From Swiss-Prot:
UniProt EC number: 2.4.99.28, 3.4.16.4
Subcellular location: Cell inner membrane
Primary residence: membrane
Annotated family: In the N-terminal section; belongs to the glycosyltransferase 51 family.
Catalytic residues (positions): 188 (proton donor), 466 (acyl-ester intermediate)
Membrane among keywords: yes
One annotated GO molecular function: peptidoglycan glycosyltransferase activity
Residue ranges of the region described as Transpeptidase: 415-702
Source organism of this protein record: Haemophilus influenzae (strain ATCC 51907 / DSM 11121 / KW20 / Rd)
Protein name from the UniProt record: Penicillin-binding protein 1B
Length: 781
């Protein structure tokens, strides 16, 4: 009876237990479904937040200056070829890819690269350049069948800024070669266009391998999963992370089309390391390893990049060339097996070397110029706006050829002088600037041009010595009633007493003196005594006002007599500011390394203002330039005459006390070159401006094509003859420029009175430093 009763009770409980279990299962399933939906929604929000927003903190791309080929420039055949080669175009027998050109009798056919220029994007163009009598005479667009007067060349990427240790060049999918895409899919994910984000067969295969190994050793990831892992997840290998990867891949594939996923992958994938900075995306990797855009590399180079996806470090072509070669050939073999290439082409490509360039440097090649550019950005835009430049294109003013020539000139000359003078601590710096636009073409901060160290061109403040003199003479020549180029200036030793200081006794460098010397000869020979006499006569305040107007407005200039001989410190960058104004005949333009900036959409957000402000009389600047030409012709820089007499260069040497610093500023028909040579510890160089810094300038001239300095005088300046004593002589062969401020006729007259220091009967000039002297009347000479 008891047994029967228990059986009945059990049979009654079974349906109830089943109902309880089913209820629990239903609740659990519903809860799991709700949680999955919510979690899936959360993952979807995470994915959309990134994919629909700013996926990457894109670096600002810095490019070299924009260059054009113009008929108006009257370019020779060889000059055009050199321009193309300098811009990394390739001479070929068949024009097939952007960047190719070939020679045909009296013409050149070139496939010009496409590029988003600051004002507008321009597509690639097939152009024929025709020459007549060895000069460019006609440019034909072979697609539109029209002639053009000029065409622009795409600038070179020279740096990337503000990238959070990740560099990439994100480009649209349509700009990637179809062959790259097909090779990538063949190698990494053959069912990419068929699966829904994950490949179950691949995952199962990887799961079995991992279980057997007892740890995660293999992945079966699709391209979508790889993208999810790189964009959203950590690098740890756990089951939880793998589950998230799979779920997010499903969501990503459901939310976005395959092309969007593929484009993001191509721009995201990690492909190497540039120092501390990661190289992401195939476009940047192509430039990093081959020095060319992804659209211009060969099929075997595509195979190498695709092969590196599996392990950028293991297959690094510089560190592990044999591994890289084997991996590339595996990819080529896959392409052969799937009939993407034929056997003959496979044999050819698999025998090729890797074809990588010398160790890649994307963002560290021109550190001194880039440091100067970053300082420019802070001055022009302010710190708060620099962060908004992410993804922008910065078009710099750097001329790649001039930069290389300047680097080689500094490196070669300083190294030679180190050996010659047995002084291994010598250093050098150089800045080259187009004085008509204020655009800086080259910056060299020291001998180690490839390393971002101390930028002497921008940061080193050193005494300038005689470089100060042209500004003093220009101040005097701005007053033509008192000073002209042939005005005789006293050249006898003087003593000046200043309150609170020992008597100051300036001396000429060569310790030679005379009764007087013409003003222009005093500058040409860089004589100290006449310079001090002129400066004291016009007044230190006026000299300082002139210097600040010409570009030294942020320089601390001491109001003491010694400032007339450059006793204060200035950087080569600031020196260039003043000489830019002088070379531009008194027209001051702000120096810049930035020509323009465009955002990612191509909108112009900055443009350098090339307009000049006249800050000193043009007539005075013209006469000062003429006197500086005399410096080269017969003065302290006369060694230039041997090879460059026909260029009529202007220049100024500078040497400081005990030869601690040597300087030279050279002016040609287009550029100013400011050169400093010295020691970081301020030690003696045993050199002068002529034997030190000038030698760097000479080396630079030997490497480049220089325009003749042909200055057009203002209409108020006329050429008048003088004799050997400086008196007017219209029959003389020697003529000088004279400012006809009152319509004078100088023939037959004597020159201006000889200038001597102020005497007791003279009234000191207003705001002159004679006011602060113990004895306002210097000793009689």
């Amino acid at each position: 009876m008891t047994s029967q009763h228990s059986a009945k009770k059990s049979s009654k409980n079974t349906p109830k237990n089943n109902r309880t279990f089913k209820g629990f299962l239903l609740k659990f399933s519903f809860t799991a479904l709700v949680l999955t939906i919510f979690y899936g929604g959360y993952l979807d929000w995470q994915i959309r937040s990134k994919m629909d927003g700013q996926i990457w903190h894109l670096p600002a791309e810095v490019y070299s200056r924009l260059e054009s080929v113009k008929i108006a420039d009257n370019l020779a055949f060889d000059e055009v070829i050199q321009i193309l080669l300098d811009n990394e175009y390739r001479q070929t027998t068949m024009v097939a890819a952007p960047g190719d050109f070939k020679l045909e009798d009296d013409s050149i056919v070139v496939l010009r690269r496409a590029f988003p220029f600051p004002d507008k994007a321009e597509p690639q163009r097939v152009l024929r350049l025709r020459f007549s009598h060895n000069k460019l005479s006609r440019i034909e667009d072979l697609v539109t069948v029209k002639t053009v007067d000029e065409f622009r060349l795409a600038p070179k990427l020279i740096a990337m800024l503000q990238s959070d240790n990740e560099d990439r060049l994100a480009i649209p999918l349509q700009n990637y070669p179809r062959l790259l895409i097909d090779t990538l899919i063949l190698t990494e994910d053959r069912r990419f266009y068929e699966h829904n984000g994950i490949n179950p067969v691949g995952i199962l295969r990887a799961l079995i391998a991992n279980i057997r190994a007892g740890q995660t050793v293999q992945g079966g990831s699709t391209l979508t999963q790889q993208l999810v892992k790189n964009l959203f997840l950590s690098r740890e290998r756990t089951i939880t992370r793998k589950a998230n990867e799979a779920l997010m891949s499903l969501v990503l594939d459901w939310r976005y089309d395959k092309n969007r996923i593929l484009e993001t992958y191509l721009n995201e994938i990690y492909l190497g390391q540039n120092g501390d900075t990661q190289i992401h995306g195939f476009e940047l990797a192509s430039q990093f390893y081959f020095g060319r855009s992804i659209r211009e590399i060969s099929l075997d180079q595509i195979a190498l990049l695709v092969g590196m996806v599996k392990g950028p470090s293991l297959y690094n072509p510089w560190r592990n060339p044999q591994n890289a070669l084997e991996r590339r050939n595996i990819v080529l073999r896959l392409m052969l097996e799937h009939k993407m290439i034929g056997d003959e082409l496979y044999q050819l490509l698999s025998q090729r070397p890797l074809g990588v360039q010398k160790k890649g440097q994307i963002s560290r090649k021109y550190p001194a110029f880039i440091q100067t550019l970053q300082a420019d950005l802070r001055r022009k835009l302010g710190e708060h706006k620099i962060s908004s430049l992410l993804g922008a294109r910065i078009f710099s003013t750097m001329d790649l050829k001039q930069q290389a020539q300047a680097e080689n000139a500094v490196g070669n000359t300083v190294s030679q002088l180190q050996l010659k003078m047995k002084n291994p601590h010598l250093e050098g710096a150089m800045i080259i600037t187009d004085y008509r636009t204020g655009e800086i073409r080259a910056v060299v901060g020291g001998l180690q041009t490839q390393y971002a160290g101390f930028n002497r061109a921008l940061m080193a403040k050193r005494q300038i010595g005689s470089l100060v003199k042209p500004s003093i003479y220009l101040t005097a020549l701005s007053n033509p009633e008192q000073f002209r180029l042939n005005t005789p200036i006293n050249n006898q030793p003087i003593t000046i007493n200043v309150k609170g200081s020992p008597p100051w006794q300036p001396r000429n460098y060569d310790k030679k003196y005379s009764d007087s010397v013409m003003l222009m000869d005093a500058l040409a020979r860089s004589l100290n005594i006449p310079t001090v006499n002129i400066g004291m006569k016009v007044g230190l305040s006026k000299v300082i006002d002139t210097q600040k107007a010409m570009g030294w407005d942020n320089v601390e200039i001491p109001k003491v007599p010694a400032m007339l001989l450059g006793s204060y410190t200035i950087s080569p960058y600031d020196v260039t500011k003043l000489y830019q104004t002088l070379a531009n005949q008194g027209g001051r333009i702000a120096l810049t390394t930035v020509d323009s900036i465009a955002d990612r959409q191509g909108n112009l957000i900055f443009q350098h203002d090339k307009s000049a402000k006249q800050v000193v009389p043009q007539e005075a600047a013209f006469q000062t330039l003429f006197a500086m030409q005399q410096t080269v012709e017969r003065g302290t820089a006369r060694s230039l005459q041997k090879d460059y007499a026909d260029l009529h260069l202007a220049g100024k040497t500078g040497t400081t006390n005990e030869s601690r610093d040597t300087w030279f500023v050279g002016i040609d028909g287009k550029n100013i070159s400011t050169v400093w040579l010295g020691r970081d510890d301020n030690g003696e160089t045993k050199l002068t401006g002529a034997s030190g810094a000038l030698q760097i300038y000479k080396d630079y001239l030997n490497r480049t094509n220089i325009e003749k300095l042909a200055i057009t005088p203002p209409t108020t300046v006329k050429w008048v003859g003088i004799n050997q004593y400086g008196d007017w002589d219209c029959e003389s062969y020697r003529t000088i420029p004279i400012w006809l401020n009152n319509g004078q006729n100088f023939c037959g007259e004597t020159s201006s009175p000889s200038l001597t220091p102020t005497t007791e009967t003279e009234t000191p000039p207003q705001e002159s430093l004679w006011d602060v002297l113990d004895n306002p009347n210097p000793p009689a000479q």
